[in-house]
């Protein structure tokens, strides 16, 4: 049996643009993709912290160091510029591989610059945010 596991996430990024008429995808600063080990064309889920919307799309590389995180195509109806989002990548693996998995969690600031990279998906990324009291630290 294969399990679908979170392999990477870019946590609490700020949407810099939304383009309804662009071919669908999410444009992500190449530095963020590299830090998260997310490939160009890889399927990702986007969770909008601001409004609760969830969607799946694929990544395209944005200019390195630009901080770009652009929502393209029909998804622009669901996510607005300035929204805070989480990009999540998943992978399928055996139970043994899943138990050994150390996901890449990229924490960013409001300008989408990397603040920290770790393997704990429950770690609070910034002051004022807390780990759920129900979550077990990784």
Swiss-Prot record:
Gene3D superfamilies listed in its UniProt record: 2.40.40.20
Top-level taxon: Bacteria
Regions annotated as coiled coil: none
UniProt PTM comment: Is synthesized initially as an inactive proenzyme, which is activated by self-cleavage at a specific serine bond to produce a beta-subunit with a hydroxyl group at its C-terminus and an alpha-subunit with a pyruvoyl group at its N-terminus.
Pathway in which the depicted protein is active: Cofactor biosynthesis; (R)-pantothenate biosynthesis; beta-alanine from L-aspartate: step 1/1
Keyword Isomerase: no
Active site: 25 (schiff-base intermediate with substrate), 58 (proton donor)
Pyruvic acid (Ser) modified-residue sites: 25
Cofactor(s) recorded in Swiss-Prot or TrEMBL: pyruvate
InterPro entries per UniProt: Asp_de-COase-like_dom_sf, Asp_decarbox
Cofactor binding notes: Binds 1 pyruvoyl group covalently per subunit.
Biological process per Gene Ontology, one example term: alanine biosynthetic process
EC number: 4.1.1.11
Reaction(s) catalysed (UniProt annotation): L-aspartate + H(+) = beta-alanine + CO2
Entry's Gene Ontology molecular function annotations: aspartate 1-decarboxylase activity
The keyword Thylakoid is annotated on this UniProt entry: no
Subunit structure: Heterooctamer of four alpha and four beta subunits.
NCBIfam families listed in its UniProt record: panD (TIGR00223)
Name recorded for this polypeptide: Aspartate 1-decarboxylase
Organism: Clavibacter michiganensis subsp. michiganensis (strain NCPPB 382)
Gene that encodes the chain: panD
């Amino acid at each position: 049996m294969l399990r679908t596991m979170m392999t990477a996430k870019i946590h609490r990024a700020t949407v810099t643009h939304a383009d309804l008429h662009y071919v669908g995808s999410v444009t992500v600063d190449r530095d963020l993709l590299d830090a998260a080990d997310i490939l160009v064309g890889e399927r990702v889920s986007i969770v909008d912290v601001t409004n609760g919307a969830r969607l799946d799309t694929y990544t395209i590389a944005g200019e390195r160091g630009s901080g770009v995180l652009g929502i393209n195509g029909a998804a622009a109806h669901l996510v607005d510029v300035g929204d805070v989002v989480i990009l999540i990548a998943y992978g399928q693996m055996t139970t043994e591989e899943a138990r050994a998995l150390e996901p890449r969690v990229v924490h960013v600031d409001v300008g989408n610059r990397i603040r920290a990279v770790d393997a704990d998906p429950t770690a609070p990324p910034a002051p004022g945010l807390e780990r759920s009291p129900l979550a077990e630290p990784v």
